[in-house]
């Protein structure tokens, strides 16, 4: 298991120097943030980012993410040009030594929360989601969240939502299949593994289709193009926000297939209505058994990349909601501690014989 940490570039208040000081963190997950969605990422920018990260004593093997243009998801006539750009970006990333590319196929909205700083009993703040609050939101007013590939003006958002009125789940599946059949052969040649991220939360939002919600969706995706390069970012928090999803079982099933290329591990506390709040990583803090999930990775021989996902804001820290230093650092150390215990004590009985 290779422990990584997301970094938003030079504008990120969490510096590479601080990340380097987290015990056990060896890799950075980042992206090129100043290129318009749909354009080719220049090779020199990728190499410059890699050099910056390596100067800090860290490694850069995982990109999160290369955004997929809405015209590809919509299946518009201009998608072939955009897919060609995407394929060229994959080639550039592979040439720079990038091994995994995380991406998503969520229409319009990336991860969606209704609160970015909900106060918990201990005084920390977290990201939270309320179904009732979503029902009261008018998406035409414009919504922006940290980490999105773009923020839309109200008129742009209204036009996009209108375009998606004719796109149901079946159409979105067809457009994902078209996309994967075009990019996976290039990823294979470039030595890059594509890793689709689940819908977050794993349910329709604002009437838009969602097709990466559960076990059956994940199984269908890996069957669309049967290649080791067509895999998953298995996000415990995203999938765990769906009460029907058994995250440990998902890790065991798709881990045994070798299709989990990137793991996001975080905890959520989910109520009976499907509302949730993001908690500390510790199992007892949320609804997920993080120790059992990590054991599932260990048992299936996972050797890929892991990162602690969204954290609370604690100890007076300010910055990107969900992406502060302190709680994510605690999460990384907790996950590494679980892994070390499994690695050492799972083999202890055999060693004593």
From Swiss-Prot:
**Gene3D superfamilies in the record:** Divalent-metal-dependent TIM barrel enzymes (3.20.20.150)
Kindly state which reaction or reactions the protein catalyses.
Answer: D-mannonate = 2-dehydro-3-deoxy-D-gluconate + H2O
The answer to whether UniProt assigns keyword Iron to this entry is yes
UniProt keyword annotations, A-Z: Iron, Lyase, Manganese
Q: What EC number(s) does the entry state? A: 4.2.1.8
Q: Offer one example of a GO biological process linked to this entry.
A: D-glucuronate catabolic process
Q: Which family does it belong to?
A: Belongs to the mannonate dehydratase family.
The record's section on HAMAP family has: UxuA (MF_00106)
Note the PANTHER family from the entry. Answer: MANNONATE DEHYDRATASE
What name is this protein filed under?
Mannonate dehydratase
Organism from which the protein derives: Burkholderia cenocepacia (strain ATCC BAA-245 / DSM 16553 / LMG 16656 / NCTC 13227 / J2315 / CF5610) (Burkholderia cepacia (strain J2315))
